[in-house]
Amino acid sequence: MGNRGKYVAGGALVLAATVLLLAAGGCVTTPWRTADGRIVTGKIDFQHEETTGRTYHLYIPTNYNPKRRYPLVVTAQGTFPFDEAAGQRNRWVDAAERYGLIVCSPDFDSASGFLSVPKDRPAPPLVHDEKATVAIIKEVRSRYSINPDGIMITGWSGGGFPAHFIGLHHPEIFRCIVGRTANFTENLASDDVALRARHMHVYVFFGESDLPGFAAQNREANFWYTMRGFRNFVIQPQPGGHDPNQIEAARYFLNIVNHWPAIQIDASTTEGPAPLPVTLRALVRDPDSPDGRVDSVLWNLGDNRISSSPEVTHTYEQPGLYNVFLMVKDLDGHQEFKQTWIKVN
């Protein structure tokens, strides 16, 4: 039986299945699978994450195959009434079908160009959105086959605020952040948060004829990220105006997923009394090098020691918190970064 026999298009299923009318607002929830367990594809509307109750919308490619691992795009809508979560999802349908992406569009409270972001504390809507987004991703990953090395958070216009904030606070989830003609302020993250996320990929672009203020905010992002050591940060003006440009974001994202090495640090221990011996191994998955060969590996062990070996055993003699920073350069010259911390008591 072909894939189309196994997986039912969302629109056809809604005609054949019983839909749920939500008491609050009467919105129609699309079942994400049929009664006999088949995955529904296409537009999946008004899902509600179990623990937070947050609404989100999905697009599942019509040729979805659970034997594959799919890149996941988490996208934040622009300022209401110019955009909303379902409409933001709809903007991604063509890219999702063309490139094989699963798209998740939560209903963000903080996706507004008018959001006030204090210097001394996170804005409450950002914190609420962060909690909901993490829970939604957990739910989505439990239902679908997701590439853990291929999760992007992106925002258009006012959606830049939650995209940057949530991405920076969760580098353990997201491979990259993309701001699409999006808002930014340096108040979104502390220097400590930036330090823990500086290995990430970040891309911001704005229109050459963009709305007032967006070029300046993206140049502010350029300064902020660059000064905090984000080595894989890119800024690029694009022709046109305030264009959400999903295709540009998708191409950037998929270039990373399909051609850059994904790396992890395997540490024998991350905490203990001094002197603390630790064995560190660089784990590399490179789509362009199935045999695992890379050009070079470089460790900064956090105490003014370096190593170029894929596996290194090092003893930390003094108490302290050590930031271990790893760079892997692949055979095509791409430099990927990862980091961890060793706490010596």
What are the residue ranges of the model-derived segments?
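Bacterial N-terminal signal peptides
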Residues: A12-A23
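A domain-start/cap signature at the N-terminus of enzymes
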Residues: L21-P71, D129, T154, G158-F161, ...
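Serine-hydrolase catalytic machinery in alpha/beta-hydrolase-like enzymes
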Residues: E49-H57, R68-I146
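Loop/turn elements at helix/coil->beta-strand transitions in domains of secreted/extracellular proteins
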Residues: R68-L72, R98-V103, N147-G150, P171-C176, ...
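Cell-envelope and extracellular/periplasmic
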Residues: T75-F80, R141-Y144, W156, A163, ...
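Primarily recognizes the serine-hydrolase "nucleophile elbow" in alpha/beta-hydrolase
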Residues: S142-R143, D149-R196
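The feature captures the conserved acid-bearing segment of alpha/beta-hydrolase catalytic domains
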Residues: C176, T181-L254
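Extracellular/lumenal mature domains of secreted and surface-exposed proteins
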Residues: L254-N345
